[in-house]
UniProtKB/Swiss-Prot annotation:
Bias type Basic and acidic residues, positions: 987-999
One Gene Ontology cellular component: cytosolic ribosome
Keywords: ATP-binding, Cytoplasm, Elongation factor, Hydrolase, Nucleotide-binding, Protein biosynthesis, Repeat, RNA-binding
Main localisation: cytoplasm
Known function: Ribosome-dependent ATPase that functions in cytoplasmic translation elongation. Required for the ATP-dependent release of deacylated tRNA from the ribosomal E-site during protein biosynthesis. Stimulates the eEF1A-dependent binding of aminoacyl-tRNA to the ribosomal A-site, which has reduced affinity for tRNA as long as the E-site is occupied. Assists translation termination by stimulating the release of nascent protein from the ribosome by release factors.
SUPFAM superfamilies the UniProt entry points to: ARM repeat, P-loop containing nucleoside triphosphate hydrolases
Positions with a binding annotation for ADP: I42, H44, S83, T392, H396, E397, N703, E922, N925, H951
Organism: Eremothecium gossypii (strain ATCC 10895 / CBS 109.51 / FGSC 9923 / NRRL Y-1056) (Yeast)
Name of this chain's protein: Elongation factor 3
Lineage of source species: Eukaryota, Fungi, Dikarya, Ascomycota, Saccharomycotina
Recorded name of the encoding gene: TEF3
Length: 1044
């Protein structure tokens, strides 16, 4: 098109014709103008003068209808010229005004014209037209104009859904205001447009709640109920500006509600949703709305747990939004602003100035570029497709493309970017290359992350407890990861921690054969390669130690000809010899492996890549664990236990009567041996040791040597076949088994708080009631028939009821059965009255009634004020000492906890009664590196004794001083400092003021201060004062305790 004399003349004639056109012939004139403007005429020019005249015509009452109809025809042309489109959009404000005109005919034509323009424009030019529409909606007082504009916005959603989604943060407030309009027609139209606009919210988590969210905007009284509904939602989908724009109004109101429960749930939703935000710029526009509410609630909410939840949401919002420590809000990126892109374009074309008449086209190009930046479309071809038609209005195509490419590069440079990850891949066959999200229960674990695996590579999977490492492995094995190859395409085998308990009596050979992995001959040969003897192959699985069970599971996996081995803590229970064997096998077998392990040495020796959980993504690092730590120093705790910032703390053990130093033995074993029934020789023999409050003992030895058996006898799980085991009367032992989950596996549907309440509700530890040293067996029953001669009468003990101090030991109150006609057929034993109870010394009772004595000792220890109230607050505080958040303790079921979180729960439950001795069987199983470091430091600081069975020299090297080496059932101690009697060292004092004390039912025990002993002079003075009062008051005198 050209403003040459000829073109000006033609357009002038057409415009004159339009000015005088009647209603019957104006359509024909409009069509003729539209065809001329969009036709093949001279290039590199625009119809500037014509559109100036057309704008005047729209404003003129006489020509408005004809001008509007002309605009509609131009917009409706099949091929709208790029030199015309920007000028058509510039007419939108005038068209909007005419939709509210008094003339109904003009109103109708204007509404149709506005819809035609909206449908005609390039969707990526939304940044030009939408501000015109929203400004009209906010500023006009004419309800007809508002209704027409709302209809145009609805049409815009259909025409440019993706682009409208990015504009939702600025659109929702405008539509919300229209929903509160006093005019019924506007309210209905605004609600319909809001419903239409929310179709751009592509979020499966909240789409079913969108009607309620819209209702909340119209009726704020629905906020509480809607927050409750959303509070139970699992958020797994990526959170976009459109999602936040519809959610933030609700959350903002939820934070301001009066009920603490609503404030808490709003904080939980903010925390969960913000974790799914990919780009800080997505949340940036909403920070000023959400941060003040969270900060205010954290400062004012009285409930500590709700305040903690609020703080967690606040921390997540600050982290995701890149908010500084002083709460200075980050600057919102202006990379996608029209002003910014226009500035870049002006800078590029300053040497080839563009004529002023092209200003609308230049602005249009800047708007298109701004939208492409917002959509993060940086592909060269996409920019050519969208921008070239408009750039060629004033430049030739070749020059246009050169400018566009430079324009793209400079505009893209303004986009805020996260860390630039180098490609850590190398050449090789891809086994898997997929993108997926993963959730467990109500928790999002991974969001739109990529996983790429090569054949014959070994990958270490690292991340904190609860990140979802085992969940990801299990999801892969169960075919629940989107895009991961099926078992037919790629055979994947998951090697779990433990073999199913229902297989306990199955022989090793039969167990492997059940997996349909080959003939018995092939299986037997493979098991021999793995070190199994013929005798072991025929043994039941229950007879294998933990290490051999793990080796069996590995052998079974290998026999399945796996392409990918999923190894979850493969070194658990393995001794150093078998770990070395496993390292060699994995390095030479040529099978792709994904390994979860907290053994840093093992990962160093095996892994070629580390896959690390970072912000709901998996990031791959080339090299082993030590190389990974160099690239990611924040993960230093994976390599050095002491580098962990996490802190655990064990409760201080109570005072033990008669124990005046930390060296005095509280457990002593002499000449002890143990043999399982039906076996040919003792599992352990000739064992001698002692433990004190200062003990730091590492129990080491190969698999099957008898380590766990030794500890089971020490803790009372098993009774010794021969020998003596002495335990201090009030000593409490916390024992965490090798299979730590055995403690909780029957309580998976309880919360951790409910489990601890169940376990200690009677005042005793219900998990220990079935220990062998508390069960009365036949031998015990026989020895309890011992006859005592008391006051000349033969008696048997019926019960032992209480205890009191007697010299340097204790004596116990016993009730009796009286013997009549002993040794005769008519022998009988008659219960005696309680007045006949007698006190017998411990030495006399222990030989025949040791277990009954132990029961009384335990009850006395609990009654002495060592019990803790089973309140939610007390349980949450105790669990927090071992790294479990209140949210998990009181609001999550055990079933939903990760392996590491379950171990922390077991640690918390076992130490609830403030033990004097902590016994840990393979504590490195399941705990992540941070937690292991925290556990190590907590055990060092613990005031009681510690015994650890482990194959991890790294864990015990700086922790233990004494070593019990167990081999072939013989225990050889070294580094011990056993003493007879109290030994040397600082004297232990009983702390009188240890805070509030509670009995076994949780009732507070009132403890008065000891009265000071008065001197003789003070006693005489008191006596004189009493006598004086008595003389003065006579019979009215009543003495008080204070007078003595």
């Amino acid at each position: 098109m050209s403003d040459s004399a000829q073109s000006i003349k033609v357009l002038g004639e057409l415009f004159e014709k339009l000015s005088v056109a009647t209603a019957e012939n104006r359509e024909a004139t409009a069509t003729e103008i539209a065809s001329f403007l969009n036709g093949n005429i001279i290039e590199h020019d625009v119809p500037e003068e014509f559109f100036k005249n057309l704008t005047k015509a729209v404003k003129d009452k006489k020509t408005a209808a004809a001008a509007l109809e002309t605009i509609a025809h131009i917009a409706n042309e099949n091929n709208l010229s790029p030199s015309v489109e920007p000028y058509i959009v510039d007419l939108v404000p005038e068209v909007c005004v005419k939709t509210g005109d008094k003339d109904k005919d003009v109103q109708s034509i204007a509404s149709e014209t506005l819809l035609a323009i909206v449908k005609a424009i390039d969707p990526v030019a939304i940044k030009v037209i939408l501000p015109h529409l929203t400004k009209s909606l906010v500023t006009t007082n004419k309800w007809q104009e508002k209704v027409s504009v709302l209809a145009a916005i609805s049409a815009l959603v259909d025409a440019a859904k993706t682009q409208v989604a990015l504009r939702m943060p600025e659109l929702i407030p405008v539509l919300s205001e229209a929903m509160w309009d006093t005019k019924k027609e506007v309210k209905h139209a605004a609600t319909a447009t809001m419903t239409k606009a929310t179709e751009t919210v592509d979020n499966k988590d909240i789409e079913r709640f969108i009607p309620e969210l819209i209702q909340c905007i119209a009726d704020p009284s629905q906020v509480s109920e809607t927050v409750h509904l959303l509070g139970a939602t699992t958020f797994v989908a990526e959170v976009t500006p459109a999602t936040l724009s519809i959610m933030v109004p609700l959350l903002n109101r939820g934070l301001a509600e009066r009920e603490t429960s609503i404030k808490r749930k709003a904080a939980v939703i903010i925390d969960n949703m913000c974790k799914l935000v990919e780009d800080p710029q997505v949340v940036a526009p909403f920070l000023e709305k959400l941060l003040p509410g969270l900060k205010n609630n954290f400062a004012t909410i009285a409930d500590p747990e709700a305040r903690e939840v609020t703080l967690r949401g606040l921390k997540t919002l600050r982290r995701v939004g890149n908010v500084s420590d002083d709460d200075t809000l980050p600057e919102v990126s202006h990379a996608g602003d029209i002003v910014t892109t226009r500035g870049v374009l002006d800078e590029l074309t300053k040497d080839t100035p563009i004529a002023p008449r092209f200003a609308p086209v230049v602005n249009y190009i800047a708007a298109i570029a701004a939208d492409l930046i917002d959509e993060r479309i940086i592909d060269q071809q996409a920019w050519f497709t969208h921008v070239t038609p408009y750039m060629t209005v004033f430049f030739h195509e070749k020059q246009s493309k050169e400018i566009i490419d430079d324009f793209r590069k400079r505009a893209v440079d303004n986009i805020p970017v996260g860390p630039n990850f180098d490609d850590e891949e190398d050449e090789g066959e891809d086994l898997c290359n997929c993108e997926f999200s993963l959730a467990y229960g109500a928790k999002i674990l991974l969001n739109k992350t990529q996983l790429r695996l090569k054949r014959a590579r070994r990958y270490g999977l690292c991340g904190p407890n609860g990140a979802g490492k085992s969940t990801l492995m299990r999801a892969i094995a169960n075919g629940q990861v989107d895009g991961f190859p099926t078992q037919d395409e790629c055979r994947t085998v998951y090697v779990e921690h433990d073999i199913d308990g229902t297989q306990a009596d199955t022989s090793v050979l039969d167990f492997v054969f059940q997996g349909d992995v080959g003939t018995r001959e092939v299986i037997t040969e493979k098991l021999r390669e793995f070190g199994f003897s013929d005798e072991m192959i025929a043994m039941p699985i229950m007879s294998l130690s933990g290490g051999w069970k793990m080796k069996l599971a590995l052998a079974r996996a290998v026999l399945k000809n796996a392409d990918i081995l999923l190894l979850d803590e493969p070194t658990n229970h393995l001794d150093t010899v078998n770990v070395a064997w496993l390292v060699n096998y994995l390095n030479t077998c040529g099978i792709t492996s994904i390994i979860v392990s907290h053994d840093s040495g093992f990962l160093d020796n095996v892994c070629q890549y580390i896959i690390h959980y970072e912000g709901l993504k998996l990031r791959k690092y080339k090299g082993n664990l030590s190389e990974f730590v160099k690239k990611c120093p924040t993960a230093k705790s994976y390599y050095e236990l002491g580098a962990s910032d996490l802190e655990f703390k064990f409760p201080e053990p109570g005072f033990l009567e008669g124990v005046k130093t930390k060296q005095k033995a509280i457990v002593k074993v002499s000449n002890m041996s143990f043999q399982y029934p039906g076996t040919s020789k003792p599992q352990i023999a000739d064992i001698n040791f002692q433990c004190s409050l200062s003990s730091r003992i590492a129990v080491i030895g190969p698999n099957g040597a008898g380590k766990s058996t030794l500890i089971n006898v020490l803790t009372g799980e098993l009774l010794p076949t021969t020998g003596e085991v002495y335990t201090h009367e009030n000593c409490r032992i916390a024992y965490i088994k090798q299979h730590a989950f055995a403690h909780i596996e029957n309580h998976l549907d309880k919360t951790p708080s409910e489990y601890i309440q169940w376990r200690f509700q009677t005042g005793e530890d219900r998990e220990t009631m079935d220990r062998a040293n508390r069960q009365i067996n036949e031998s015990d029953a026989e020895s309890m028939n011992k006859i005592f001669k008391i006051d000349g009468t033969p008696r048997r003990i019926a019960g032992i009821h209480s205890r009191r101090k007697f010299k340097n030991t204790y004596e116990y109150e016993c009730s009796f059965l009286l013997g009549e006609n002993i040794g005769m057929k008519s022998e009988r034993w008659v219960p005696m009255m309680s007045v006949d109870n007698a006190w017998l010394p411990r030495g006399e009772l222990i030989e025949s009634h040791s277990k009954m004595v132990a029961e009384v000792d335990m009850k006395e220890a609990l009654a002495s004020g060592q019990f803790r109230p089973l309140t939610r607050k007390e349980i949450e505080e105790h669990c927090a000492m071992l790294g479990l958040e209140a949210e998990l303790v009181s609001h999550s079921r055990i079933r939903g906890l990760s392996g590491g979180q379950k171990v922390k729960l077991v640690l918390a439950a076992c130490t609830w009664q403030r033990p004097h001795l902590i016994v840990l069987d393979e504590p490195t199983n399941y705990l992540d590196r941070d937690s292991l470091g925290a556990l190590s430091k907590a055990l060092k600081a613990f005031e009681g004794g510690v015994i650890i069975i482990t194959h991890s020299a790294e864990f015990t090297k700086d922790l233990t001083e004494e070593v019990w080496a167990v081999k072939d059932g013989i225990m050889t101690p070294s580094g011990h400092n056993w003493v007879s009697g109290q030994g040397s060292g600082p004297r232990l004092e009983k702390k009188e003021d240890e805070g509030d004390k509670f009995d076994a039912m949780g009732n507070k025990i009132a403890t008065g201060n000891k009265k000071k002993k008065l001197s003789s002079a003070e006693l005489r003075k008191k006596k004189k004062e009493r006598m004086k009062k008595k003389k003065e008051l006579g019979d009215a005198y009543v003495s008080s305790d204070d007078e003595f």
